[in-house]
From Swiss-Prot:
Entries under InterPro entries matching the protein: MraZ, MraZ_C, MraZ_dom, MraZ_N, MraZ_sf, SpoVT-AbrB_dom, SpoVT-AbrB_sf
GO cellular component terms given for this protein: cytoplasm; nucleoid
One GO molecular-function entry: DNA-binding transcription factor activity
Main location: cytoplasm
Family: Belongs to the MraZ family.
Disulfide bonds: none
Listed Pfam families: MraZ
Name this protein carries in UniProt: Transcriptional regulator MraZ
Key words, A-Z: Cytoplasm, DNA-binding, Repeat, Transcription, Transcription regulation
BP-aspect Gene Ontology terms: negative regulation of DNA-templated transcription initiation
SUPFAM superfamilies, alphabetized: AbrB/MazE/MraZ-like
Length: 150
């Protein structure tokens, strides 16, 4: 389970040091092999490779005659890029993925259970604040969330 928020920096080559609290688990569970792809919210999704393979298999087993399925396959699988933690626990983020998410220097890594989201810091702060505001304005939880006692 990956949880928590970490503010990080990209170096001039586009590498990000994975926080040590995740590094050992990633080496144990997937030998440091990760898959990075795009998300419709403007961030990147970072999966341990075995978890990505499970998701990819499920997605690709759907009928691609369905327009939404086909689009999701194109976006997620089409942009999926394998990478590996180097000896210092860093991952190299490919330029096209950095460009998509607007990643330059300051980034935020957000644990999401089976994966991470990787955001440009300014975009993360703006989005997070908007979500809190929307939540305050809505005040009524969805039926799915009511049972969680959050």
């Amino acid at each position: 389970m990956f949880r928590g928020v970490a503010n990080l920096n990209l170096d001039t080559k586009g590498r990000m040091a994975m926080p040590s609290r995740y590094r050992d688990r990633l080496v144990e569970t997937c030998e440091g092999r990760l898959v990075i792809t795009v998300d419709r919210d403007g961030c990147l999704l970072v999966y341990p490779q075995p978890e990505w393979e499970r998701i990819e298999q499920a997605l690709m087993s759907r009928p691609n005659m369905d327009r939404q399925v086909r689009r999701l396959q194109r976006l997620l699988v089409g942009h999926a890029t394998e990478c590996e933690l180097d000896g210092q626990g860093r991952i190299l983020l490919p330029p096209p993925l950095r460009d998509y998410a607007g990643l330059d220097k300051r980034v935020v890594l957000v644990g999401q259970g089976n994966k991470f989201e990787l955001w440009d810091e300014d975009t993360w702060v703006k989005s997070r604040d908007e979500w809190f505001k929307e939540e305050d304005e809505t005040a009524e939880p969805s039926a799915v969330l009511e049972s969680l006692s959050l």
